[in-house]
Regions:
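A short glycine-rich, Lys/Arg-flanked "PGG" loop and its adjoining helix->strand segment in the class I
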Residues: 46-61
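Conserved SAM-binding strand-loop segment of SAM-dependent methyltransferases
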Residues: 9-22
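Conserved class I S-adenosyl-L-methionine
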Residues: 61-99
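A short SAM/SAH-binding and catalytic strip from SAM-dependent methyltransferases
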Residues: 31-46
Length: 167
């Protein structure tokens, strides 16, 4: 937070460090809420949706990205390799069994919470949101020529981006 304050010391910005599950902002206090790659680390998505909905103004927008449920389903988040060491296929198992998954990320053991696409979509709908966009990003065509291993990223979705509007 010190670095953020240093980069943008505007008195109009209030920097806080709190767990997402504990945030409690005043109703109708934001026009937009953006979250990047966070919710697969939280057990409950429904609670987040309810709280974000409350703090958004009418017609406010909620935009977020998560690791795609196909990516988080199996847990170890790695390919199954063939006898030559090349990716043979991506394991998708226990997809409908939501809950704790253990993975290695940047050399660290991390705990994630797998959720189905249904959970993300219905969590938004139950909170009162109208989904306006849903995207499963793919590598740009130019990357496929310059970074050959990116071709494997066309074999399964890794990320999910959703935008929703408060009704």
């Amino acid at each position: 937070l010190d670095k953020a304050r240093e980069i943008n010391p505007s008195p109009l910005i209030e920097y806080k460090r709190i767990a997402i599950e504990d945030f409690d902002f005043a109703p109708n206090s934001f026009d937009i809420v953006i979250s990047s790659l966070t919710f697969h680390y939280l057990e409950s998505f429904d609670k987040v949706c309810t709280e974000v909905y409350k703090c958004l103004t009418q017609e406010g927008v909620f935009v977020f990205s998560v690791e795609h449920p196909v990516f988080t389903a199996y847990g170890n988040q790695d390919w199954i390799y063939d006898s030559e060491g090349k990716p043979a296929h991506w394991p998708v198992d226990h997809y409908f069994q939501e809950g704790v998954r253990h993975a290695r990320f940047l050399g660290e053991d991390v705990t994630k919470y797998h959720k189905t696409l249904t959970t993300y979509v219905n969590g938004l709908i139950k909170a009162g949101f109208c989904i306006t966009h849903l995207v499963e990003p793919q590598p740009d065509e130019s990357m496929l020529d310059t970074v050959p291993e990116m071709r494997d990223e066309l074999r399964r979705p890794m990320m999910l981006l959703i935008a929703a509007r408060k009704n």
